[in-house]
């Protein structure tokens, strides 16, 4: 049974007496002539642990709102803590926080979006990644989501080169997940012994076959399940979610693929200790088990079930290409990036 479903049930059961308590307190306040302090969001009482603004990339929204947050609220350190949530394309979310959107916890799909907040006013501390998990909340891998039965017979990234298929992947200038996808294509070629120029040619071929580039990973999944394309490049967890929700799809883990690492941090103005307590909960065994039961690979190696999450034969990492700082400059810089140049030639927006 999925932990997310268990947590939702616990949350509902716990919420009934809480609702009665709120009602009784409201009646008491009116009876005593107290004033009504209206506010947006869920808020907390004066003795509570504060309100946390979670800003994240699109795909883990349900894990937060239906599992992680309710479970934390039921813990001793989460008592009195409430949440406000904002989820969307990773790059858009990062830019919004840099522009002033309130955020206590930020969770993006790639480290470049986190580094933006370090560089612009140190909204996030420079040492955000200096812990045993290097600031990573959970892992995944790049997979193919295909129609039931895999009618095109897609097994590896090489098949995307040789077969006449319509591909869906998000726009890499708004979506972090798309950058993982593109680097998986590139990395597969490099791992096979091809030159950087040859690898970039394979990226070009994939983008030429791409029939839709939605703004986020979640939007890309929606486009695919609504009938567009033959194959979707996606996070493994999104593929698992689609299968569990009864979509007429299945997924393939290529033998050579890229590990996805999603960074998380507290912001400098986050209410403490609530923000750090929630971050610690996300890294706790309970938090990591919630991620695992929702299709994400735990960062704690002791909690990884090899039957559920078998290690691909050739698993490579973004660090193999110099890390996101180098990768973003070389491939995704709007003015000089090689992928940006390809996208512009194809008439795709690179403005983010």
PLM feature spans:
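Ligand-binding pocket segment of bilobal, Venus flytrap-like solute-binding proteins
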Residues: 192-255, 263
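C-terminal motif of bacterial Sec signal peptides marking the signal peptidase cleavage site
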Residues: 27-31
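Extracytoplasmic/periplasmic substrate-recognition and gating elements
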Residues: 247-289
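Short helix-loop capping/hinge motifs at secondary-structure junctions, enriched
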Residues: 124, 149-155, 174, 187-195, ...
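N-terminal segment of the mature folded domain
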Residues: 37, 41-174, 314-317
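Ligand-binding cleft/hinge of the Venus flytrap
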Residues: 70-77, 158-218
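Short beta-strand->loop
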Residues: 126-137, 157-158, 243-258, 266-267
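Extracellular/periplasmic juxtamembrane helices and adjacent flexible linkers that interface
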Residues: 6, 34, 273-352
């Amino acid at each position: 049974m999925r932990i997310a479903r268990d947590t939702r049930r616990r949350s509902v059961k716990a919420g009934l007496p809480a609702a009665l308590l709120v009602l009784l307190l409201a009646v008491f306040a009116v009876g005593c002539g107290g004033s009504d302090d209206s506010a947006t969001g869920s808020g907390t009482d004066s003795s509570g642990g504060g309100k946390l603004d979670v800003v994240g990339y699109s795909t883990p929204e349900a894990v937060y709102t239906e599992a992680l947050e309710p479970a934390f609220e039921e813990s001793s350190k989460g008592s009195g803590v409430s949440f406000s949530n904002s989820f969307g394309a990773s790059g858009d979310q990062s830019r919004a926080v840099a522009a002033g959107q309130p955020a206590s916890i930020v969770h993006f799909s790639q480290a470049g979006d986190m580094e933006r907040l370090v560089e612009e006013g140190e909204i996030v501390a420079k040492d955000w990644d200096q812990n045993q998990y290097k600031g990573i909340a959970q892992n995944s891998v790049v997979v193919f989501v295909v129609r039931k039965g895999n009618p095109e017979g897609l097994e590896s990234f090489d098949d995307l080169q040789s077969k006449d298929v319509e591909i869906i992947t998000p726009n890499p200038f708004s979506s972090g997940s798309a950058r993982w996808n593109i680097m998986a294509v590139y990395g597969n070629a490099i791992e096979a012994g091809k030159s950087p120029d040859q690898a970039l040619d394979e990226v070009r071929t994939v983008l030429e076959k791409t029939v839709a580039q939605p703004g986020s990973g979640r939007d890309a999944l929606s486009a695919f399940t609504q009938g567009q394309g033959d194959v979707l490049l996606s996070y493994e967890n999104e593929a698992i979610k689609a299968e569990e929700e009864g979509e007429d799809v299945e997924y393939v883990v290529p033998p050579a693929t890229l590990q996805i690492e999603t960074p998380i941090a507290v912001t400098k103005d986050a209410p403490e200790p609530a923000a750090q307590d929630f971050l610690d909960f996300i890294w706790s065994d309970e938090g990591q088990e919630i991620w695992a039961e929702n299709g994400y690979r735990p960062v704690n190696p002791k909690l990884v079930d090899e039957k559920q999450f078998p290690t691909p034969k050739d698993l490579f990492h973004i660090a193999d290409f110099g890390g996101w700082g180098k990768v973003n400059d070389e491939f995704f810089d709007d003015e000089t990036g090689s992928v940006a140049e390809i996208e512009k030639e194809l008439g795709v927006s690179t403005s983010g």
